């Protein structure tokens, strides 16, 4: 122990060393006996007083002694303290000191307050070892003002010491009172019979050595509560804050066969082998198949829920309610697993279908490049080519086949395209310089002139395939699309620009070069059906709608009468499909396959595709009214697949009373002409 004047400095020394300035301690002790008694009494009073801080610990909780100087705890007090040792708080190293008979004439000053090496007491029998210890029960010793304190693992003893015991000290720190800091070769003295007789009125008591074995000087923490016993909901409601134990940052987690996680803190286990020995199972990583199975068939959103009791502020569940909730939870998990299994099977099926399509495309590309394209004029009308065409064109040769199928009846050359493009650029330049004047002119111009304006082209380009982000301003194909549409307005001022042309031009740009795309675009819009729609020829458009209704009634009579009951005419949904050639209504890859067969069969396939869409969603449309039907057909579902759609298209028969599409349309043209003649004759 360190005295009050040491200011925290160490006051213990190695065995056999002398304190500096005390080489003649024997002479000084004889001359200063009275001074030593006075200093000892003051130190005893210092220790026995409560609420006084020592340099090696706080003794605030020592039993309060007498008011007089030198008053010490009595034997009865010490017995009471030892009996109620659990109630005595020793927060940071304070020692419980019992009374002892101080040797007369002790003039050791502060030496008696230091940790000293024990020497044989007068009552120790000869031949006994002055210090004895056991390796299994490490002990330490310290003296406080003539009181020898023996710290053992099982009990705490107080022995008398002589003045000679203060001369031999061993090294130690005021905080290093733990057994593992005992100097090498030191042990505690054996108990002397004389001491036992003198202290016979004081029975042996269990002292504070038990506190040292409990890690007395370390910070005490509360025992962690089991998380499973704490009520609360993990996901819903307000949960009161729960006290959780501080976990080590390094946690060994083991995944057992039941899927639960067991964690072991690393300081508690020496190595993994010890953990395996305690748990009785080896630590093996889960196999790849097991891990994959868990990822595919265990829904994390439901199996991660932990069933707990209700919060403490709510009534507890009854047994019946607990069983019912458990059953409902198991049912939800089972349903979620079924959905996961179905989703995994669906993804697997789609992957197989995609692989099959890629293999078919690869084999078809070889046939097209080696057999069909070199002999196009001869092979294009054969049954083999038509069947291969129906399955879809490989993307690598799609643009070339489209160019050959559409043809170039207008005899447009790349040089002609450059001429019209330069004219369009001049118009853009003049439009930017006189923007206000052009706006005034557009306000008083005709409908065709307004649609041919560059402002309308700009607006429509920004709405072309917005999900691709390649045709908008700043995209890689923005200027290219703008050039083709501007050149076409200069090439066909009678048609100008109509909303929907940007989608057709964009699909061609994705599959052809710039000049070839413009040639195909101009020739495609020159077809009778597209020309009638883009020139907004109402009489021709009505004839196409009438021909469509003939085959509509032939193939889908129930849906046809359902549409007529709500007065739903074909123009409400066919105009958008024909203007954009299904590139806006269908997914892009599916629209390209529609374009493949459209290049083979012509305008007939456009109306056949419309009937295929109606057949695909016939059951849904029969349950809808006018508004919902129009909304549904304007924006078709995005999950439509090419196999289902083309299966429904193949089921549509484009024959009516042994008449094909062209024959029906021609007869309708004659009827309309005869009707026009009769109306004119009646007027005259």
Swiss-Prot record:
Record's compositionally biased regions (Low complexity): 129-138
Coiled coil regions in record: 331-365
Entry keyword annotation includes Coiled coil: yes
Keyword Coiled coil listed: yes
Every Rab-GAP TBC domain range: 392-602
Superkingdom: Eukaryota
GO molecular function, one term: GTPase activator activity
Basic and acidic residues bias locations: 172-183, 240-250
InterPro entries documented for this protein: Rab-GAP-TBC_dom, Rab-GAP_TBC_sf, Rab_GAP_TBC_domain
One Pfam family recorded for the sequence: RabGAP-TBC
Region of interest (Disordered), ranges: 1-41, 119-138, 169-202, 219-290
Role summary: May act as a GTPase-activating protein for Rab family protein(s).
Protein name in the entry: TBC1 domain family member 12
Species classification: Eukaryota, Metazoa, Chordata, Craniata, Vertebrata
Gene name per UniProt: tbc1d12
């Amino acid at each position: 122990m360190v005295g009050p004047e040491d200011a925290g400095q160490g006051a213990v020394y190695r065995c056999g060393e002398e304190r500096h300035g005390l080489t003649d301690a024997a002479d000084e002790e004889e001359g200063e006996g009275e001074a030593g008694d006075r200093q000892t009494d003051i130190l005893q009073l210092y220790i026995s007083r409560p609420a006084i801080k020592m340099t090696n610990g706080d003794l605030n909780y020592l039993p309060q002694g007498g008011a007089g100087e030198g008053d010490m705890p009595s034997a009865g007090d010490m017995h009471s303290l030892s009996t109620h040792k659990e109630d005595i708080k020793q927060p940071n190293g304070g020692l419980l000191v019992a009374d002892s008979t101080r040797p007369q004439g002790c003039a050791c000053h502060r030496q008696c307050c230091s940790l000293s090496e024990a020497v044989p007491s007068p009552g120790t029998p000869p031949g006994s070892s002055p210090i004895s210890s056991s390796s299994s029960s490490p002990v330490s010793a310290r003296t406080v003002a003539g009181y020898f304190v023996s710290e053992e693992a099982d009990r705490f003893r107080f022995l008398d010491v002589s003045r000679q015991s203060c001369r031999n000290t061993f090294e130690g720190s005021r905080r290093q009172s733990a057994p593992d800091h005992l100097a090498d070769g030191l042990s505690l003295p054996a108990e002397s019979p004389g001491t036992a007789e003198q202290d016979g009125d004081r029975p042996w008591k269990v002292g504070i050595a038990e506190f040292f074995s409990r890690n007395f000087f370390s910070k005490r923490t509360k025992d962690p509560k089991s998380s499973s016993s704490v009520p609360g909901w993990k996901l819903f409601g307000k949960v009161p804050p729960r006290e959780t134990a501080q976990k080590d940052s390094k946690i060994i987690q083991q995944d057992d066969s039941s899927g639960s996680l067991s964690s072991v803190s690393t300081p508690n286990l020496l190595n993994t082998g010890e953990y395996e020995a305690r748990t009785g199972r080896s630590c093996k990583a889960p196999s790849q198949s097991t891990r994959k199975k868990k990822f595919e068939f265990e829904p994390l959103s439901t199996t991660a829920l932990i069933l707990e009791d209700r919060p403490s502020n709510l009534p507890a569940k009854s047994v019946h309610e607990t069983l019912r909730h458990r059953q409902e939870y198991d049912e939800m998990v089972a349903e979620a697993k079924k959905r996961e299994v179905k989703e995994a099977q669906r993804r697997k099926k789609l992957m197989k279908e995609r692989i099959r399509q890629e293999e078919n495309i690869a084999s078809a590309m070889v046939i097209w490049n080696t057999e069909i394209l070199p002999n196009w004029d001869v092979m294009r009308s054969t049954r083999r080519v038509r069947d291969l065409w129906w399955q879809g064109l490989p993307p690598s040769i799609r643009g070339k086949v489209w160019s050959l199928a559409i043809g170039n009846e207008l005899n447009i050359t790349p040089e002609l395209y450059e001429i019209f493009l330069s004219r369009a650029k001049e118009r853009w330049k003049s439009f930017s310089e006189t923007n206000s004047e052009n706006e005034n002119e557009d306000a008083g111009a005709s409908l065709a002139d307004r649609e041919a304006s560059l402002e309308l082209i700009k607006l429509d380009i920004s709405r072309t395939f917005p999900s691709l982000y390649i045709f908008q301003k700043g995209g890689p194909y923005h200027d290219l699309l703008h050039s083709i549409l501007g050149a076409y307005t200069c090439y066909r001022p009678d048609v100008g620009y109509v909303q929907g042309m940007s989608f057709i031009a964009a699909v061609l740009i994705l599959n052809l070069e710039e000049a070839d795309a413009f040639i195909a675009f101009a020739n495609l819009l020159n077809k009778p059906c597209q020309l009638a729609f883009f020139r907004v020829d109402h009489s021709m458009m009505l004839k196409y709608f009438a021909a469509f209704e003939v085959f509509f009634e032939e193939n889908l009579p129930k849906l046809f009468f359902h549409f007529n009951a709500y007065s739903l005419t074909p123009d409400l949904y066919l105009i958008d499909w024909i203007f954009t050639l299904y590139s806006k209504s269908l997914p892009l890859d599916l629209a390209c396959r529609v374009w493949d067969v459209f290049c083979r069969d012509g305008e007939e396939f456009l109306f056949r595709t419309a009937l295929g869409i109606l057949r695909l969603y016939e059951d849904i449309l029969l349950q809808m009214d006018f508004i919902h039907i129009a909304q549904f057909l304007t924006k078709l579902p995005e999950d439509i697949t090419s196999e289902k759609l083309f299966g429904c298209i193949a089921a549509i028969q484009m024959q009516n009373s042994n008449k094909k599409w062209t024959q029906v349309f021609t007869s309708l043209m004659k009827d309309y002409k005869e009707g026009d003649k009769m109306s004119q004759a009646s007027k005259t």
